[in-house]
A protein has these predicted regions:
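Substrate-binding groove/exosite segments of carbohydrate-active enzymes
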Residues: 1-8, 12-164, 179
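A generic structural signal for solvent-exposed, polar alpha-helical segments
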Residues: 32, 77, 184-186, 203
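Surface-exposed helix-capping loop/turn segments at secondary-structure junctions
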Residues: 59-60, 169, 206-211
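Short N-terminal micro-motifs specific to bacterial/archaeal maturation
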Residues: 69, 123, 140, 167-172, ...
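A ubiquitous short alpha-helical element
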Residues: 118-124, 185-192
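Flexible glycine/proline-rich, aromatic-decorated loop/lid segments
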Residues: 168-182
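Active-site neighborhood of glycoside hydrolase catalytic domains
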Residues: 189-211
């Protein structure tokens, strides 16, 4: 159940004394708050915080009723919110997401939707994850936990080596399993791929001293 509806089934002979439910979720509390003098905005903030919470169980997820897989693109959006909103217990799930991403890679390929059997490589999302703005860097900036950088350095280097450069020094695009950069149209894939690749390279280089 995800808060949308509750269906009870019982025979006619059953006498109902009380009906109810118990909410369950990841072991963390929402402690951050943002308030405005506009109740509509306050409601939006409350709903947004709850959305993050219900998307946290044994892993981060896109949404609990349609897509429970831990897609890295979703985690990259959720991770910064964790440090604004949740207590320190949520950092354990954040670290687990990084561990899953790094340790469940397929050879030199960093894939999304892990753990799980329906993993896929979306190069843009994997580059984002190991970039200066990705969820690994975000976690480190907020915790100072160098262990995740030790996990990440060699796999990140090997992943970046999967790309080749053209005569102009720009990366030659890789399709992976899904060449996805954004929804809708007029997405400048070449610019985005080079930008994410460069940022991932800078971030990886900055972590080399921890080898």
């Amino acid at each position: 159940l995800f808060g949308e509806q509750i269906i009870y089934s019982f025979s006619e002979s059953v006498k109902i004394l009380c009906l109810g439910y118990r909410s369950s979720g990841y072991d963390t509390d929402i402690i951050g708050s943002f308030t405005y003098d506009d109740e509509i905005l306050n409601t939006l903030v409350k709903k947004s915080a709850n959305t993050l919470y219900v998307c946290m169980r044994d892993n981060f997820m896109d949404c609990p009723d349609r897509e429970r897989g831990q897609w890295i693109g979703d985690v990259s959006v959720q991770m910064p919110q964790v440090f604004y909103l949740m207590d320190s217990n949520a950092q354990k799930l954040a670290k687990k997401a990084i561990s899953d991403f790094i340790h469940l890679r397929k050879g030199d390929v960093l894939v999304g939707n892990v753990p799980g059997v329906h993993f896929s490589e979306l190069p843009a999302q994997s580059l984002n994850a190991i970039s200066e703005m990705g969820f690994i860097a975000e976690y480190y900036r907020n915790t100072g936990d160098t262990e995740v950088l030790l996990w990440t350095f060699e796999p990140a280097v090997r992943y970046l080596m999967l790309w080749n450069l053209n005569d102009g020094g720009l990366v030659i695009g890789r399709n992976g399993n899904w060449r996805w950069f954004d929804h809708l149209y007029n997405v400048d894939e070449d610019v985005l791929e080079n930008a994410w690749y460069y940022s991932a390279k800078v971030c990886t280089k900055n972590g080399r001293h921890l080898r």
